[in-house]
């Protein structure tokens, strides 16, 4: 995870750990949202799971009720003024106007830049509020493009993300999300206990700066970071 100065030596580490994990998880979520927004803008809405990978899916559904596929998920209504080929056949290729597509792609890029690691070198502190504001912008843009999500299936990734319906299999551990109750703070190669204060380890010097890393418990010491320049 990125660097951040602690609020002071008297801060209890549990509070800092909660803050760090919230920022880390929001950053990852915003990255997923940016990618999903980009895919929707450039490739159109995602098909139902039953039709993904089908090249000529119109032939597949012509004898079916157009609103359902084998009695399962509903096909989203066609929304868009253009159609482009979609190589993976996971998405419909139905695109909105060039102006709306550009707005969506531009916003996806802004979101990526907001959370880019270059912000560390620029000494820009990424906050929860900054990311929540970006989510609000993306949500408003989606409502403008697809009012009330009309034209998008329940499985559309950006819709799932904005509605907080993402699910992860903890056994597979495929996500870098950090649950606060299963993570720990590391400083100078030392794992700090959440119930203690920072000064318990490093004293009460208010001017000291440390590189703090957070990762899941049991994964060992993180890689050492370079010294922070004044």
Label the model's feature ranges.
Residues 1-230:
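Ubiquitin system architectures
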């Amino acid at each position: 995870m990125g660097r951040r100065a602690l609020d002071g030596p008297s801060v209890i580490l549990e509070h800092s750990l909660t803050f760090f994990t919230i920022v880390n998880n929001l950053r990852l979520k915003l990255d997923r949202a940016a990618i999903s927004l980009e895919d929707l803008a450039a490739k159109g809405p995602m098909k139902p799971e039953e039709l993904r990978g089908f090249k000529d899916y119109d032939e597949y559904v012509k004898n079916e009720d157009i609103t359902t596929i084998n009695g399962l998920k509903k096909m989203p209504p066609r929304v868009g003024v253009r159609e482009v080929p979609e190589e993976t056949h996971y998405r419909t290729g139905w695109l909105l106007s060039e102006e709306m597509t550009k707005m969506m792609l531009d916003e996806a890029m802004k979101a990526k830049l907001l959370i880019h690691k270059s912000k560390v070198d620029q000494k820009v502190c990424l906050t929860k509020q900054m990311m929540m504001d970006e989510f609000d912008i993306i949500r408003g843009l989606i409502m403008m493009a697809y009012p009330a999500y009309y034209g998008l299936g329940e499985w559309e990734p950006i819709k799932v993300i904005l509605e907080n319906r993402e699910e992860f299999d903890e056994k597979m551990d495929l996500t870098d999300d950090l649950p606060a109750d299963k993570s720990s703070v590391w400083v100078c190669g030392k794992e700090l206990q959440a119930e203690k204060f920072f000064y318990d380890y490093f004293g009460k010097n208010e001017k000291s700066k440390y590189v703090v890393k957070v990762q899941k418990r049991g994964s060992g010491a993180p890689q050492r970071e370079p010294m922070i320049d004044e």
